[in-house]
Structure formats: structure tokens, C-alpha cells
């Protein structure tokens, strides 16, 4: 089972990771970057990024994204350093 939700990122997100969840971010609006394990990747509308379990990540910039979480999003599986 998966979940899909829209997220409005207004400020740079805090670096975090998930132990069990894979996420796919699809950028709907805005221009910014995704930071994956310290590597920055430029994103713009219709860019997509797959984030595997254990990957420390964050979004940088003002973005509207579609977040696809597999399995479905569980706030208990959100870990911060």
C-alpha cells in the first residue's frame, strides 16, 4: 500500500531519513534542489526523485511537490540526526 499527498515546502526542509519507507517526490511548482546524502540535485516542475530507505534527504527552496510514500506514510518512520 502507498500514500500520495501534496506538500507545500515554504522553507528549506530539515535533513531526515526513513528506515522503511521509499519516497518519490514529483515537483509540481517551483525551482530548487533536493539534497540526497549530501549531493544536491537541481529540480524544477515535472522533475522526480526517488528516495530510498536510509537516504538522508531534504528539499531546498520553495516547492510544491507530490509525495508518493511506499509503504504509506508513517510519521513514526521519520528520523532526524
Which residues fall in each region the model found?
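Short acidic-glycine-tyrosine-enriched beta hairpin
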Residues: 38-54
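Active-site donor-binding loop signature of nucleotide-sugar glycosyltransferases
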Residues: 9-11, 45, 53, 70
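Glycine- and acidic-residue-biased ligand/ion/polar-headgroup-sensing regions
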Residues: 20-32, 37
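A short glycine-rich, His/Asp/Glu-containing loop-to-beta-strand
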Residues: 1-15, 21, 68, 77-79
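Ligand-binding loop in jelly-roll beta-barrel domains
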Residues: 53-78
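A cytosolic small-molecule/anion-sensing beta-strand core signal
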Residues: 5, 28-29, 44-45, 61
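Short glycine/proline-enriched turns and hinge-like loops at secondary-structure junctions
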Residues: 18-20, 61-62
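Well-ordered beta-strand positions in beta-sheet-rich domains
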Residues: 24, 40-42, 56, 62
Amino acid at each position: 500500500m502507498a500514500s500520495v499527498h501534496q506538500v507545500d515546502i515554504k522553507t528549506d526542509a530539515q535533513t531526515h531519513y526513513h528506515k522503511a519507507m521509499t519516497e518519490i517526490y514529483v515537483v509540481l511548482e517551483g525551482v530548487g534542489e533536493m539534497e540526497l546524502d549530501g549531493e544536491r540535485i537541481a529540480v524544477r516542475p515535472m522533475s522526480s526523485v526517488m528516495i530510498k530507505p536510509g537516504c538522508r534527504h531534504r528539499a531546498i527552496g520553495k516547492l510544491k511537490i507530490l509525495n508518493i510514500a511506499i509503504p504509506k506514510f508513517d510519521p513514526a518512520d521519520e528520523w532526524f540526526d
